[in-house]
Regions:
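Long, well-ordered alpha-helical scaffolding segments within enzyme catalytic domains
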Residues: 142-154
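A contiguous pocket-lining binding segment that forms or flanks enzyme active sites
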Residues: 123-127
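N-terminal strand-loop-strand beta-hairpin
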Residues: 1-119, 154-186
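Catalytic DNA-binding helix-loop module of base-excision-repair DNA glycosylases/AP lyases
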Residues: 130
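Short, well-ordered alpha-helical microsegments
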Residues: 16, 141-142
């Protein structure tokens, strides 16, 4: 069992550009940018304990993840996180469907990943906003906040699925946040 420890902030486009400059100045390692499609499922056992099953498709590969919230009052999110690579995402989706799990939330994301000061810093663009997440252990997260001068930024307590439910488009039982064709090209 793994544990995800992270802090998230909502930022604007000017702050995104400043963060890239601060990351470069701090000697951060750029790990590249990717486009993701994230599908979260509803079904048996997920309604209790804030549990999530997610199938993420990224650049021709897929990752299947189980997440479960853990109690914490520090302002840093902690969640159980178990994930595995999937060879055939379509087959897994069929298996989940056969077991009674159905897609409930879908969101697309452009993610730029950096490594600095012992943490992973990601700059995320979703159809409804720009965000930065810092993931690692608690002390290095706080150190990275200071190094990158984002400790005064507005924290975002909601998860991307929660934000998708607020800002996405309802399509029957499914809520989606997808880029338009024009947004995908930019």
């Amino acid at each position: 069992m793994g544990t995800e420890i992270e802090k998230k902030y909502r930022i604007g486009s000017a702050e995104t550009a400043r963060l890239r400059e601060r990351l470069r100045a701090a000697g951060a390692e750029a790990r590249g940018a990717e486009f993701e499609e994230n599908i979260l499922y509803a079904g048996p056992g997920l309604e209790r304990g804030n549990r999530v099953l997610r199938l993420r498709r990224v650049e021709g590969r897929a990752i299947f993840t189980f997440k479960e919230s853990m109690a914490d009052s520090s302002g840093i999110k902690r969640r159980r996180e178990d994930e595995t690579a999937v060879d055939d995402a379509d087959a897994l989706a069929d298996i989940l469907d056969a077991l009674g799990y159905t897609p409930a939330v879908v969101y697309e994301k452009r993610r730029e990943t950096w490594l600095v000061a012992g943490v992973e810093v990601v700059l995320d663009e979703l159809p409804f906003g720009l965000y930065v997440e810092i993931e690692g252990e608690e002390e290095p997260i706080l150190e990275a906040e200071r190094l990158l001068e984002i400790d005064g930024a507005t924290e975002e307590p909601k998860s991307y699925p929660q934000l998708t439910l607020l800002h996405g488009t309802k399509n029957g039982a499914l809520v989606e946040a997808r880029f338009t064709a024009k947004q995908k090209d930019s």
